[in-house]
Every structure is written in C-alpha cells, then in structure tokens.
C-alpha cells in the first residue's frame, strides 16, 4: 500500500527520457535515489548552478541518470509518515508501518518516534520486507533508531505551516 513506509509505499520507478544524452533502454535497479535528489541532479544535467547558499538534503546523481555509473548514497534517507489525516490507514493493520524509517546502505529500519515497533530489513536480500531481522541485529537497530528518532525530534514541527 502507498500509505506506509514499507517498500511498496515508497519505492517507485523513475523514467527519464533525454535522447541527446541518455541511451534508450537502460535500466538501473541498484541506485537509491529520492525526490530530494532531483533538484541538484537536474540542475547539473541542465548546466544550471544551484542558488548561492543552497544546502538541501539531496545529492547530485547526474552520472546515474546519464547511465554512466551506479550510485552509492553518501547520506542516509529518512522518512516520517504520520502527521496527516491518512496516518493509521489503511484499515488493515498488516499494511500499516511504523511512522519513521531510515535507509542506510542495505539496511532499512522502521520504528515509531518513541522507539517502539522496530523492524529491520536487509533490503538487498529482502526487498519485500518479509524477514524482520531486528532481533538478530540489536546494535544496528539501536544506531539507526537513535539517528532517525533524533532527526524526527529536530524536525517534527517543520512543515506544519
């Protein structure tokens, strides 16, 4: 369901067509990009400098979109889903995720802001998130949980205006 932070809710295809620069028919299923990466990436491809002082969270993946390399994220991705009228939906509890998630390399942790309901997945081996390995990797749960919960606390009041 798209109303969750499971891969089915946040993973989506991204299709780029730019005949003068991108060879048709290329597929990249390995690189992990996010919407915040689009601004610096598209500016770079278009030869446009980002505005002076720009400090967005996105990374420039121009070489990935141009088919010249695979991407390895330099920063973790974090999500917060739950500050709107759709939280607690869908009605099927099995489709509901905790409201925070962090992706760090192949690891993805879902957790609530109070530290409850931690679920850890190795996305490279388990892209459908069927095998929660949180019990086997408490150190990763602790590290990523602390990071995403701190991020949430620092940002939870932003975007309400």
Over which residues does each language-model region extend?
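Intrinsically disordered, low-complexity polar regions and short flexible loop motifs
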Residues: 126
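Short amphipathic alpha-helical coiled-coil/interface segments
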Residues: 137, 144-148
């Amino acid at each position: 369901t798209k109303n969750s932070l499971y891969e089915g809710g946040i993973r989506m295809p991204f299709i780029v067509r730019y005949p003068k620069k991108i060879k048709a028919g290329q597929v990249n299923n390995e690189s992990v990009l996010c919407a915040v990466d689009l601004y610096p990436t598209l500016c770079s491809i278009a030869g446009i400098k980002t505005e002076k002082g720009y400090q967005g969270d996105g990374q420039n993946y121009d070489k990935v979109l141009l088919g010249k390399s695979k991407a390895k994220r330099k920063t973790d991705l974090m999500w917060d889903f739950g500050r709107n009228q759709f939280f607690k939906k869908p009605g099927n509890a099995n489709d509901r995720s905790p409201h925070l998630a962090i992706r760090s390399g192949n690891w993805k942790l879902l957790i609530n802001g109070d530290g409850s309901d931690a679920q850890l997945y190795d996305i490279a081996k388990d892209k459908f998130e069927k095998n929660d390995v949180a019990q086997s990797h408490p150190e990763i749960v602790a590290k990523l949980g602390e990071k995403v919960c701190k991020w949430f606390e620092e940002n939870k009041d932003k975007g309400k205006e």
